[in-house]
Amino acid sequence: MKSATCLTATVAAALLAAARLASATDMPSAEEMWKIIQQQQREIEALKRGQQETAEKVEAAAELAEQSQPSVSTASSWAENTQIGGYGEMHYDNLDSGKQIDFTRFVLFFDHQFTDRLRFFSEVEIEHVIASSDEDDKGEVEVEQAYVEYDLTPTQHAKAGLFLLPVGILNETHEPTTFYGVQRNPVETYIIPTTWWAGGVGLKGEITPGWSYDFDVHEGLDTSASDDYAVRSGRQKTSEADANDLASTARIKWTGTPGVELAASVQYQQNVTQGNDPNAGDAWLYEAHADIQRGPYGLRALYARWDLDGRGPKAIGADEQEGYYIEPSYKFTPKVGIFGRFNQWDNQAGGNGNNTEMKQYNAGVNFWPHPDVVLKADVQMQDNDGAKNDNGYNLGIGYVF
């Protein structure tokens, strides 16, 4: 027992001595310790710099994300508040005056809602496909609408810019899917010069439920004796328009029964030649119409008349220019409808001794394969005493989106 105890003590002493010897041998010097401390300090500083750079990158990324968010939101808001649309029509005319195919109109709409009360409307049109300086090209590029509208109240609105005048049935709504016949009717072409737009300001609103009004002040016509004072030739289209004599247009409209529109318009201009012709004076336009669609039955009727003052218009009978048409229609289905129309107009109805009255009969069919696409066909017959008749048929296709 005593031997075992001594052996244990001897082994322990030997191990302790070996450990002390090893510790003494492995212990770094003071210089080595200083180098180790400096290396560790450099590593700590490098880690701090890395952490700082990482923090700066994270902060920059966050700021960029914050800056990008309004841009994305703005782009999304712009897209939601902007609308693009348009319409177009192509005609094939086979008439006594000639045969032709014409892509008559290509139109695009661009509208934008700035706020709940402020909005913008525009319409750009290319007529006859090609517009150039070549005299053989009949095309035109036209801005027919570009105006801002503001809601004074929920039922009263003000506008300023370039807009369509509130006269007739077709002038404000003339997309090909909305009317019968390939060509627009002649009364709303030669007496009411559709499409008729002008630059100015206006008010419109509801008077009572079913009754509404429009009142506009805008550029006037600029007719001339060389064009027989024809009103269509006097449109200035707000292209450096002469504004010596402005015009005023007012309309009252009743839509108190679904499918029924009754309206009357009046326009006054102090001088229909903008003061350029001493033999011409003021001009008044009077127009009334009914547009009725009750079930499959439809009826459109319109009367319009111009009274032009002055010796010049009176000498050739242009002091009175008037016309009317009546157009019944019937829809067999929502896709197929037929119509007939009688048109009579005269741009020299003042009694100059010449028979200048024009009469035209149209009958045809519309087919809508889709509510926004239409195929049309009609026949045209004229009965003119003082001019050559232009008879034949027309085919057309139109769309709107």
Language-model features: locations:
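Detector for outer-membrane/organellar transmembrane beta-barrel domains
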Residues: 253-349
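Transmembrane beta-barrel architecture of outer-membrane proteins
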Residues: 104, 126, 142-144, 197, ...
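Outer membrane beta-barrel
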Residues: 72-223, 244-261, 327-332, 336-339, ...
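N-terminal periplasmic/intermembrane-space "pro-region" immediately following the signal or transit peptide
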Residues: 22-92, 401
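Outer-membrane beta-barrel "beta-signal"
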Residues: 367, 372-373, 389-401
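Outer membrane beta-barrel transmembrane domains
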Residues: 329, 335-372, 376
